[in-house]
Amino acid sequence: MLFSSVEFLFRFLPVFMLLYLIVPAKYRNFVLLAGSLVFYGVGEPYFVLLLIFSVVVNYGISKYMFWEPAAPIQNRVQRRVKRRRAALIISLVFDFSLLFLFKYWDFAAGTVNQLAGSELIPVLALTLPLGISFYTFQMVSYQVDCYRGVIEKPPGFVPFAAYVSMFPQLIAGPIVRYDEVADRMCGRRMRIRNLENGLKLFTLGLGLKV
């Protein structure tokens, strides 16, 4: 779904904005998440499941980073460092494996096969999911910040999932670090001035794009 399409401008956006404005503030992340998944699912009905799977796995890994099992005080720091390092490695392997599979596997397989002169590695010809690079690196930045202690407390699942899948930047970026938007994800307020400024910027950007 393109931002300049009739479907987005006159169907999705009005319905989304209406729901977002009328629900209580504590439910707005649910609306944002649901709207973002619908936005992505219209263009990628199968790969929206991959996005959800990636979000669930990354959230589970980040929760493990902050898990504090019972242990003697003198061992807690050392165990925390080891646990966070292991969790970071697992998340990086998972995220970059998916990205490599969909984006670089065929190129690598074709190069190896060409050099070898035979079909050693199968070419999968997988369709590239929209925005996979952006949401993968966004989750990687989140995991790295958790490991480094930049993020001191993990958010709930819905704010995290909404942060990763937020439709305005899901398929075209930019990549945003969680600590830059944490306050707005968990405690933002709707102000008329901000809404007006947002509409002006959107209209200007749409005009430049069209």
What are these regions (language model features)?
Residues M1-V210:
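Membrane-embedded transmembrane alpha-helical bundles that form the catalytic cores
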